[in-house]
A protein has these predicted regions:
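Sec-dependent signal peptide recognition
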Residues: 2-9
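Sequence/structural segment immediately N-terminal to covalent heme-attachment motifs in c-type
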Residues: 40-66, 78-92
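Short, conserved catalytic or interaction motifs in soluble domains
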Residues: 19
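Electrostatic cytochrome c docking/interface patches
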Residues: 23-50, 145-146
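C-terminal motif of bacterial Sec signal peptides marking the signal peptidase cleavage site
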Residues: 13-16
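Axial heme c-ligation environment in periplasmic c-type cytochrome domains
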Residues: 68-74, 95-147
């Protein structure tokens, strides 16, 4: 009788430790979090990935740029006050002189080959990072409407 109870207890413990339920629980939590996040926050999160891969080498992970070469995005009046020009620069590149935070920059930023969604996402990320605060989401439709 003792061996039967011990065997039954062992089976219950093994079945109770099944990892599938835990994995499903984590998956459900991730799904819930994604549903709770606003479209802007989802875009910002995707934009962070694009920024890290495409933009951070010149504008730095801190968004502070490189003095006299690449303008800062952190606290940038050009970025936050010139929405159309900023979208155009990310989408098509930028050549020529600009003034950022009262300092001139005269370099070349090549087009990075991003699609409209990636441009919108990286714009939302940069416009809401490092102290920048923009509540109006940049959409892929808005980016598509920006012509060279």
């Amino acid at each position: 009788m003792g061996k039967i109870c011990y065997s039954a207890l062992l089976v219950i413990l093994v079945l109770g430790c099944n990892d599938t339920t835990k994995k499903q629980g984590v998956s459900n939590i991730e799904t819930t979090i994604n549903k709770v996040q606003s479209p802007l926050q989802q875009s910002i999160d995707r934009g962070a990935v694009v920024y890290k891969k495409v933009c951070s080498q010149c504008h730095r992970p801190s968004g502070k740029g490189i003095a006299n070469n690449y303008p800062p995005l952190a606290g940038s009046n050009w970025l936050t006050q010139k929405r159309l020009e900023s979208i155009k620069a990310v989408k098509y590149g930028l050549k020529g002189s600009i003034i950022v935070n009262q300092k001139p920059y005269n370099g070349v930023m090549s087009a990075m080959g991003l699609n409209n969604t990636q441009v919108a996402d990286v714009m939302n990320y940069t416009m809401n990072s490092w102290g920048n605060k923009q509540k109006e989401i940049v959409t892929p439709k808005e980016v598509a409407s920006v012509k060279k």
